[in-house]
């Protein structure tokens, strides 16, 4: 059974539909398509191959950040790095959905989301003691 190109999923749609339309355009005067055109119209391996260069999922950057390096944020040359830190200061994690900043011994450090929330909770409790 041949599927209609209009009902194909988004990840199979454009390449196979384009190949099918070029195969019908390349028919001869008597209405018969050559065997190579028919074979190229039914070949969908390039559209489903996960390592294909046209696959948007395979070519997505894992971090999603396209930075060429440190820039200044307008405060007289202070460097602003738009990439996340390499490690959490507390637990050593390298991946986190959100990076937070905390202070230890007067020094600003990078924390993963979980450690950052814990740091905020402890800071609130310690400041309530001194009130």
UniProtKB/Swiss-Prot annotation:
Name of the protein: GATA zinc finger domain-containing protein 2
Record field: compositional bias (Polar residues): 57-74
GO biological process: aggregation involved in sorocarp development; culmination involved in sorocarp development; regulation of DNA-templated transcription; sorocarp development
Bias (Low complexity): 21-55
Species annotation: Dictyostelium discoideum
Disulfide bonds: none
Positions of GATA-type zinc fingers: 88-115
Entry keyword set: Metal-binding, Zinc, Zinc-finger
Pfam families with a match to the protein in the record: GATA
Region (Disordered): 21-85
PROSITE patterns: GATA_ZN_FINGER_1, GATA_ZN_FINGER_2
Organism classification: Eukaryota, Amoebozoa, Evosea, Eumycetozoa, Dictyostelia
InterPro entries per the UniProt record, alphabetical: Znf_GATA (IPR000679), Znf_NHR/GATA (IPR013088)
GO MF term list: sequence-specific DNA binding; zinc ion binding
């Amino acid at each position: 059974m041949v599927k209609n190109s209009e009902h194909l999923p988004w990840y199979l749609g454009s390449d196979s539909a384009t190949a099918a339309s070029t195969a019908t355009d390349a028919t001869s005067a008597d209405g018969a398509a050559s065997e190579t055109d028919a074979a190229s119209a039914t070949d969908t391996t390039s559209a489903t191959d996960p390592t294909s260069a046209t696959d948007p999922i395979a070519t997505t950057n894992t971090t999603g950040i396209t930075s060429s390096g440190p820039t200044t944020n307008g405060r007289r040359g202070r460097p602003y790095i738009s990439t996340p830190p390499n490690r959490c200061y507390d637990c050593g994690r390298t991946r986190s959905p959100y990076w937070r900043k905390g202070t230890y011994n007067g020094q600003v450090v990078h924390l993963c989301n979980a450690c950052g929330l814990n740091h905020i909770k402890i800071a609130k409790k310690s400041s309530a003691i001194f009130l």
